[in-house]
């Protein structure tokens, strides 16, 4: 489950690409924000997951990206753009995780770190990674409205993952204070 990235924000991400030799920068089609990863699913589970996700009620919200980060402290393997802290985004991620758990998937063991992966790396030059992080530390995207989340499928190819939207779920519900 993920958020699709609007074109204006994707263009901003494309401007951040470069400066790290050997980095495999994500294409426009690969850009998304994962809310919850579940791995391979059989047909019966797919239907239950679809029903559970369709029942989620959460309001639309504004989102913006600010700053960058890396996964892999000693040996960086990913560069990403960070989402500004957002209670409604966190609320949606918790709702998605709970819905998936109710249909038999294990709860996500990872802390939700709202981000969009920009590049994947193997044995990068650490100086170049640090330079890239410093150069883009204060970068900020335009703000945009998140009014849906999607169920994606992915297929690994020699050019990286190919993502496809399988289903879109509109956000709806109370627009005041957030309750869990």
Regions found by a protein language model. Name each.
Residues 1-180:
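Histidine-dependent nucleotide/RNA phosphoesterase domain, centered on the 2H-phosphoesterase fold
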């Amino acid at each position: 489950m993920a958020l699709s990235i609007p074109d204006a924000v994707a263009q901003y991400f494309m401007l951040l690409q470069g400066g790290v030799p050997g980095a495999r920068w994500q294409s426009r089609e690969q850009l998304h924000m994962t809310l919850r990863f579940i791995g391979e699913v059989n047909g019966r589970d797919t239907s239950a997951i679809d029903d559970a996700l369709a029942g989620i009620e959460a309001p639309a919200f504004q989102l913006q990206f600010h700053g960058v980060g890396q996964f892999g402290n000693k040996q960086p393997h990913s560069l990403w753009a960070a989402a500004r802290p957002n209670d409604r985004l966190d609320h949606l991620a918790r709702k998605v995780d709970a819905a998936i758990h109710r249909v038999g998937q294990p709860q996500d063991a990872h802390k939700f770190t709202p981000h969009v992966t920009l590049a994947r790396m193997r044995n990068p030059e650490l100086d170049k990674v640090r330079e890239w992080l410093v150069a883009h530390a204060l970068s900020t995207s335009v703000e945009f409205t998140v009014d849906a989340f999607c169920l994606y499928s992915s297929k690994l190819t020699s050019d990286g993952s190919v993502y496809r939207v399988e289903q879109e779920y509109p956000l709806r519900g109370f627009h005041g204070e957030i309750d869990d």
